Amino acid sequence: MDYIKKAIWGPDPKEQQRRIRSVLRKNGRNIEKSLRELTVLQNKTQQLIKKSAKKNDVRTVRLYAKELYQINKQYDRMYTSRAQLDSVRMKIDEAIRMNTLSNQMADSAGLMREVNSLVRLPQLRNTMIELEKELMKSGIISEMVDDTMESVGDVGEEMDEAVDEEVNKIVEQYTNEKFKNVDQVPTVELAANEEEQEIPDEKVDEEADRMVNEMRERLRALQN
């Protein structure tokens, strides 16, 4: 019976509203989960940088700094997406409250742009496509955008020099923090201690590479 009603009269508006809100909540949970996981990665990477800085291992500090830069960039992207999702939610709620939907919704083009921007994020792609379908059924948007994946691969693509500059800032931050009181430290005693605790370069490099690969895998998992 419900199937016949839907075939004749179209989807029930209240049911569509529930579905839309459910998809919005799902997207919100996905973003919050990604932000929490990225925060854990940030903290872990910062600790690794500090540990390497204490050993005066600038090479490893720079290696971890590059990873921290990528993590920070992804975090900023997700944080911005959370604000965009809130904007989408408010516009949809306003349309539902006023019961105007597509016929009188003046900002549907702006809404489509924001939805399309969120679809470009791999973390939200599936659920945002689901939202687009529900919005089409409700008439809030007239069509799905075809070029949703056009810039997924190059979002935030930057010049190497700009990346190096940001990485250098991170390196300077932690190395300056390490050596800001260097005048107060007896140079001879420091050298003696370092000789006693010296670790083979091969082991340091292997450990650094292992940690970097682990962080990259976790970041890749978050992105996909």
Swiss-Prot record:
Superkingdom as given in the UniProt entry: Eukaryota
> Pfam family of this protein, just one?
Snf7
Q: Where is this cross-link: Glycyl lysine isopeptide (Lys-Gly) (interchain with G-Cter in ubiquitin)?
A: K203
What's a BP term from Gene Ontology annotated to this protein?
endosome transport via multivesicular body sorting pathway
* Cellular component terms per the entry's GO annotation: cytoplasm; cytosol; ESCRT III complex; multivesicular body
What GO annotations for molecular function exist for this entry? Answer: identical protein binding
The main location class comes to membrane
Presence of keyword Ubl conjugation: yes
Keyword hit for DNA damage = no
Q: Which InterPro entries match?
A: Snf7_fam (IPR005024)
> Where is this chain's protein located in or outside the cell?
Endosome membrane; Endomembrane system
* Alphabetic keyword roster: Endosome, Isopeptide bond, Membrane, Protein transport, Transport, Ubl conjugation
The way this protein sits in the membrane is described as: Peripheral membrane protein
Described function: Class E VPS protein implicated in concentration and sorting of cargo proteins of the multivesicular body (MVB) for incorporation into intralumenal vesicles. The lumenal sequestrated membrane proteins will be targeted into the vacuole after fusion of the endosome with the vacuole. Acts a component of the ESCRT-III complex, which appears to be critical for late steps in MVB sorting, such as membrane invagination and final cargo sorting and recruitment oflate-acting components of the sorting machinery.
What PANTHER family is this protein classified in?
CHARGED MULTIVESICULAR BODY PROTEIN
Q: Which family does it belong to?
A: Belongs to the SNF7 family.
| Quaternary organization | Core component of the ESCRT-III complex (endosomal sorting required for transport complex III). ESCRT-III appears to be sequentially assembled as a flat lattice on the endosome membrane and forms a transient 450 kDa complex that contains DID4, oligomerized SNF7, VPS20 and VPS24. SNF7 oligomerization into a membrane-associated filament is nucleated by association of SNF7 with VPS20; the process is terminated through association of VPS24, possibly by capping the SNF7 filament. VPS24 subsequently associates with DID4/VPS2. Interacts with the VPS4. Interacts with DID2.
Additional comment: Present with 1890 molecules/cell in log phase SD medium.
Query: What protein name is recorded for this chain?
Result: Vacuolar protein-sorting-associated protein 24
